[in-house]
């Protein structure tokens, strides 16, 4: 005999009402807390006297939304144009477009009350997990150990010794571009630059190319990275809001992709180990020090970071300078003439000889100014005791940064800041008032970009070889290529279609 339990209707109603009351109370408490927190942030917070838009001073959520939507660089640029060189961009964050702030935020610090040799990176922005340790987010002491181990591989001497590797991939790029030119189809230069830089850094880190140039396509590992930039912004944004558990619950595909990245990188790193520690590449120094203050996880995390930082940023700058030259035909003609008049053959274009192309180097600097590969501010957190930034006292716990996109386009520092004028870096009197020291595309201080020498070497050699071998004409569909691009730390670049015509000397 079976018995069926029937819940009386009044009891169901009572349960529902109780749940509703508690839910309403919870929502009311949350809303009340948010309102009180906003009132505190606007009227009582230690940063209350700094200018900025009201809603950004009241809540961090608007900063996070801009980050997730990829529009943060434009928003902060507009804030500085409206409010001045120091802007409160979140309840606890200040953005500086004062040249001295570069040194004060990112430089070496001696004799501080805190005793720290640098202002620490903001951990919520840089570390995905507690286990995620690399040269890019390591604490000060361990960062120094990792950087010293890497230093030789990134020195100018080592970069020149790696020229046969770098030059081989640039040779292959030119060959593949000639094939595209023969087909009469436009070349998507964003892809071709990415193929080249990923292949180069893959070889210099893992001892093996990604074969992007060979296959005229991205390796699946590279595609995983390229497809994850917005998801990474979402993850970081939720983490900053204290909601990283939501990212773990709602972004399983991203988590799976991260695991794939980790596992595949470990596999390649183990294969690289088999090549020994005398290859003269970027991670030779790390492998030599494994077990002597550096562990495998740190080598693994650093290797992943080197692949990203050593490929995407260089390819981005090359894409940007190509577009800016195409948009300025007189400048393109002048730099092309400089390159072609300096060399009698392709083989004369080397890492050493391209250093004499003053106008081309100025074009690269001007592209860095208008289209910095990392245009956002890289946040630091003020230590105990507070710090003076550009003569302004900032209390402990505050987040501070210098946004490259905004400071590079500030009319306070640059004549005609929105226009492409390489001459500003060559002593032209029209730009005598420009503060060229404001341009710091590789940052400053103990955590500046260790790959500066390699990046400059690659972009100089690649641009010179492209200009020497091809006449360039932009596809009309790409005339607004730069306008409104989204940025998730790195730019989300649309195709840059360029019609290539081999020059008579090389065809």
UniProtKB/Swiss-Prot annotation:
Protein name (database record): Cytochrome P450 monooxygenase tpeC
Regions that span the bilayer: 24-44
Pfam families: p450
Keywords in alphabetical order: Heme, Iron, Membrane, Metal-binding, Monooxygenase, Oxidoreductase, Transmembrane, Transmembrane helix
Presence of keyword Transmembrane helix: yes
UniProt organism field: Talaromyces stipitatus (strain ATCC 10500 / CBS 375.48 / QM 6759 / NRRL 1006) (Penicillium stipitatum)
EC numbers: 1.14.-.-
Sequence positions that bind heme: 449
Pathway the protein takes part in: Secondary metabolite biosynthesis
Enzyme class, broadest EC rank: oxidoreductase
Free-text function comment from the UniProt entry: Cytochrome P450 monooxygenase; part of the gene cluster that mediates the biosynthesis of polyesters containing 2,4-dihydroxy-6-(2-hydroxypropyl)benzoate and 3-hydroxybutyrate moieties, such as talapolyester G, 15G256beta and 15G256beta-2; as well as to oxidized derivatives such as 15G256alpha. The biosynthesis of the polyesters probably starts with the formation of the diketide 3-hydroxybutyryl-S-ACP catalyzed by the partially reducing polyketide synthase tpeA.
UniProt family annotation: Belongs to the cytochrome P450 family.
Major localisation: membrane
A Gene Ontology molecular function term of the record: monooxygenase activity
InterPro entries the UniProt entry points to: Cyt_P450, Cyt_P450_E_grp-I, Cyt_P450_sf, Cytochrome_P450_monoxygenase
Protein topology in the membrane: Single-pass membrane protein
Cystine residue pairs: none
Cofactor: heme
One cellular-component annotation, GO: membrane
Subcellular location(s) per record: Membrane
């Amino acid at each position: 005999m079976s018995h069926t339990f029937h819940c009386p209707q009044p009891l169901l109603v009572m349960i529902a009402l109780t749940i509703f009351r508690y839910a309403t109370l919870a929502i009311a408490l949350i809303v009340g807390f948010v309102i009180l927190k906003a009132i505190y942030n606007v009227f009582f917070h230690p940063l209350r006297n700094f200018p900025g838009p009201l809603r950004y001073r009241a809540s961090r959520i608007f900063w996070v939304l801009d980050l997730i939507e990829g529009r943060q660089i434009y928003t902060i640029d507009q804030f500085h144009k409206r409010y001045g060189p120091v802007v409160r961009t979140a309840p606890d964050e200040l953005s500086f477009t004062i040249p001295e702030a570069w040194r004060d935020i990112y430089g070496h610090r001696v004799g501080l009350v805190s005793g720290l040799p640098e202002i620490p990176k903001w951990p919520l922005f840089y570390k995905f997990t507690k286990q995620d340790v690399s040269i890019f987010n390591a604490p000060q002491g361990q960062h120094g150990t990792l950087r010293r181990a890497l230093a030789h591989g990134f020195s100018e001497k080592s970069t020149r010794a790696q020229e046969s590797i770098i030059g081989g991939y640039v040779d292959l790029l030119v060959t593949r571009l000639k094939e595209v030119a023969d087909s009469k189809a436009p070349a998507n230069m964003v892809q071709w630059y990415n193929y080249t830089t990923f292949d180069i850094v893959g070889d210099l880190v893992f001892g093996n190319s990604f074969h992007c140039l060979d296959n005229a396509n991205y390796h699946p590992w590279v595609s995983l990275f390229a497809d994850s930039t917005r998801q990474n912004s979402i993850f970081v944004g939720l983490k900053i809001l204290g909601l990283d558990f939501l990212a773990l619950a709602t972004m399983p595909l991203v988590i799976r992709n991260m695991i794939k990245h980790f596992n595949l990188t470990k596999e390649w790193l183990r294969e690289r180990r088999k090549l020994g520690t005398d290859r003269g590449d970027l991670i030779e120094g790390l492998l030599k020090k494994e077990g002597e203050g550096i562990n495998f996880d740190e080598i693994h995390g650093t290797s992943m970071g080197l692949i990203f930082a050593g490929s995407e940023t260089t390819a981005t700058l090359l894409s940007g300078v190509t577009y800016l030259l195409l948009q300025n035909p007189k400048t393109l003609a002048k730099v092309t003439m400089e390159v072609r008049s300096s060399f009698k053959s392709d083989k004369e274009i080397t890492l050493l000889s391209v250093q004499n192309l003053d106008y081309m180097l100025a074009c690269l600097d001007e592209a860095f100014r208008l289209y910095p590969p990392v245009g956002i501010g890289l946040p630091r957190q003020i230590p105990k005791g507070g710090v003076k930034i550009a003569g302004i006292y900032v209390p402990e716990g505050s987040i501070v940064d210098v946004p490259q996109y905004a400071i590079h386009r500030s009319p306070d520092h640059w004549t005609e800041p929105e226009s492409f004028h390489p001459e500003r870096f060559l002593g032209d009197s029209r730009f005598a008032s420009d503060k060229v020291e404001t341009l710091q595309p590789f940052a400053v201080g103990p955590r500046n970009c260790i790959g500066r020498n390699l990046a400059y070497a690659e972009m100089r050699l690649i641009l010179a070889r492209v200009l020497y071998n091809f006449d360039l004409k932009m596809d009309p569909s790409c005339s607004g290529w730069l306008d409104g691009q989204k940025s998730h730390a790195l730019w989300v670049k649309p195709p840059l279609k360029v019609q290539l015509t081999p020059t008579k000397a090389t065809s």
